[in-house]
């Protein structure tokens, strides 16, 4: 099935599904949502509003909130909070500028960040964390550390599926799919939070920009250095309208991963995935 991706009209299919997901068809919508819940085994008791009737459209259902008490954000001062609910695809050290996508599949920071060597150089030999949000998961994205938004780079691209089978077979998938690279300044240095689009994902959305739409000019760079947009650890920064992938990047020698976090393991947003290394100021 994954070999068919290159032949499918990815963007057209995604637009059709996105349009359907906005339709408010009453009982028909509720019936479809119930089928989806049953198929994916979704626990609606975790939702802030468990009643299916609360959701007039699939988009409202996809972007449902969870009960806050079920996702406490780690309180340790130096802890890095998981930005999402999902499965850890890969994590670890960046080898030079190479990241692991899956066994025998690698891609580069330069390609991931829009072929900008100067931007990529800040993460050489750093650390990365890749999480996959399945269709059944909570689809909102949260801040791993306190930080100030300095830049967002929207990079148009393909819309391959990012499910585990595709990640293991499509070369350089994350560096080819549409994505929004969000750069934050933290007390521990630079941090990148990358929202990767995928087939059938309605859109990438951030709280400061809204829906991120491709432009005719290609790569779009949004500078927020003068805007003073700040987020606390655990605060929402964006969402997907289906399910996709989030990648974190950190500079060299600035963090240590939680040894309890391993590839293929499940995570919930707010959980401790690592700690920052204090930077000494001369």
Curated annotation (Swiss-Prot):
The EC number(s) this enzyme carries: 4.1.1.65
Transmembrane parts of this sequence: none
Function: Catalyzes the formation of phosphatidylethanolamine (PtdEtn) from phosphatidylserine (PtdSer).
Alphabetized GO MF terms: phosphatidylserine decarboxylase activity
Pathway terms, separated by semicolons: Phospholipid metabolism; phosphatidylethanolamine biosynthesis; phosphatidylethanolamine from CDP-diacylglycerol: step 2/2
Pfam families reported in the protein's UniProt record: PS_Dcarbxylase (PF02666)
Compartment annotation: Cell membrane
PTM entry text: Is synthesized initially as an inactive proenzyme. Formation of the active enzyme involves a self-maturation process in which the active site pyruvoyl group is generated from an internal serine residue via an autocatalytic post-translational modification. Two non-identical subunits are generated from the proenzyme in this reaction, and the pyruvate is formed at the N-terminus of the alpha chain, which is derived from the carboxyl end of the proenzyme.
Species, as recorded: Coxiella burnetii (strain Dugway 5J108-111)
Active site residues according to the UniProt entry: 85, 142, 244
The protein's name: Phosphatidylserine decarboxylase proenzyme
Catalytic activity: a 1,2-diacyl-sn-glycero-3-phospho-L-serine + H(+) = a 1,2-diacyl-sn-glycero-3-phosphoethanolamine + CO2
Keyword check for Membrane: yes
Recorded GO CC terms: plasma membrane
Cofactor note: Binds 1 pyruvoyl group covalently per subunit.
Membrane-topology annotation of the record: Peripheral membrane protein
Modified residues (Pyruvic acid (Ser)): 244
Site (Cleavage (non-hydrolytic)): 243-244
Coarse class of the protein's main subcellular location: membrane
GO biological process: phosphatidylethanolamine biosynthetic process
